[in-house]
């Protein structure tokens, strides 16, 4: 069964002092505001409103914890970088994100959401800089890839992979589309590997030929 399906909400917190006890491996999802993080989570969980999708970027101000059937925890971090958010709120988010990414002992990996049309912004790089020193893996989802042509998507994927290779060997990158459900199997297999779970029950990752035949 897909790892993220049947995710159940547990708690939301606004301050690092309110973090719940570390019970189970945590996989964090982070991304710039309006990069498609909430849509990606909802698509992976097969749930229309598990993660709140706001029409106003930057409105998600909490860290939200969701328990998975395998016992691990999906952690939805606040979107970052939206200019209209007041400066004091931005500073609060930055402190909360940095504390969580640097200090949370049961955080085993980060799924970093980037808009495929605008990848590796300075704030994306800041997130990587916070997380890389711990040696834990980062998996980048280049979202909204359905808005690019096939050649543009392939070129973007290759370019981002080249750039992150210099930032740390533990960073992997893939294309993803919530709308077209592109890349779901690849994320599942990646996170299953982090958790040490068998991937036998997960859907197979489509081959390039299968994707072309399906019009993706």
Swiss-Prot record:
Cofactor(s) this protein cannot do without = Mg(2+)
Q: Where does GTP bind?
A: 31-38, 58-62, 76-79, 143-146, 176-178
Q: Which Pfam families match?
A: MMR_HSR1
Q: Give residue ranges for domain EngB-type G.
A: 23-197
Keywords tagged on the record = Cell cycle, Cell division, GTP-binding, Magnesium, Metal-binding, Nucleotide-binding, Septation
Quick one: which residues bind Mg(2+)? Answer: 38, 60
Keyword S-adenosyl-L-methionine part of the UniProt annotation = no
Under Gene3D superfamilies, the record lists: P-loop containing nucleotide triphosphate hydrolases
One GO cellular component this record assigns the protein to is: cytosol
Biological process (GO) annotations? division septum assembly
Q: Recorded GO terms, molecular function?
A: GTP binding; metal ion binding
Enumerate the SUPFAM superfamilies for this protein. P-loop containing nucleoside triphosphate hydrolases
**InterPro entries the UniProt entry points to:** G_ENGB_dom (IPR030393), GTP-bd (IPR006073), GTP-bd_ribosome_bio_YsxC (IPR019987), P-loop_NTPase (IPR027417)
PANTHER family noted in UniProt? ENGB-TYPE G DOMAIN-CONTAINING PROTEIN, MSS1/TRME-RELATED GTP-BINDING PROTEIN
- Entry's family note: Belongs to the TRAFAC class TrmE-Era-EngA-EngB-Septin-like GTPase superfamily. EngB GTPase family.
Q: What does this protein do?
A: Necessary for normal cell division and for the maintenance of normal septation.
Official protein name in the record = Probable GTP-binding protein EngB
Q: What is the lineage of its organism?
A: Bacteria, Pseudomonadati, Pseudomonadota, Betaproteobacteria, Rhodocyclales
């Amino acid at each position: 069964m897909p790892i993220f399906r049947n995710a159940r909400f547990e708690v939301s917190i606004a301050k690092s002092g309110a973090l719940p006890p570390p019970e189970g491996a945590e996989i964090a999802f982070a991304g710039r505001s309006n990069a498609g993080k909430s849509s990606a989570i909802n698509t992976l969980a097969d749930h229309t409103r598990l993660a709140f999708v706001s029409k106003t970027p930057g409105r998600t101000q909490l860290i939200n914890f969701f328990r998975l059937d395998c016992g691990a925890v999906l952690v939805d971090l606040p979107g970052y970088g939206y200019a209209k958010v007041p400066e004091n709120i931005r500073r609060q988010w930055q402190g909360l994100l940095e504390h969580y990414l640097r200090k949370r002992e049961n955080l085993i990996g980060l799924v970093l959401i980037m808009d495929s049309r605008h990848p590796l912004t300075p704030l994306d790089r800041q997130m990587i800089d916070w997380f890389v020193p711990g040696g834990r893996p980062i998996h980048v989802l280049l979202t909204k890839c359905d808005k690019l042509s096939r050649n543009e998507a392939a070129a973007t994927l290759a370019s981002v992979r080249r750039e992150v290779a210099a930032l740390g060997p533990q960073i992997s990158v893939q294309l993803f589309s919530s709308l077209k459900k592109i890349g779901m199997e690849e994320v599942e297999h990646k996170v299953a590997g982090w958790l040490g779970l068998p991937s036998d029950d997960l859907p197979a990752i489509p081959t390039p030929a299968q994707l072309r035949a399906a019009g993706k």
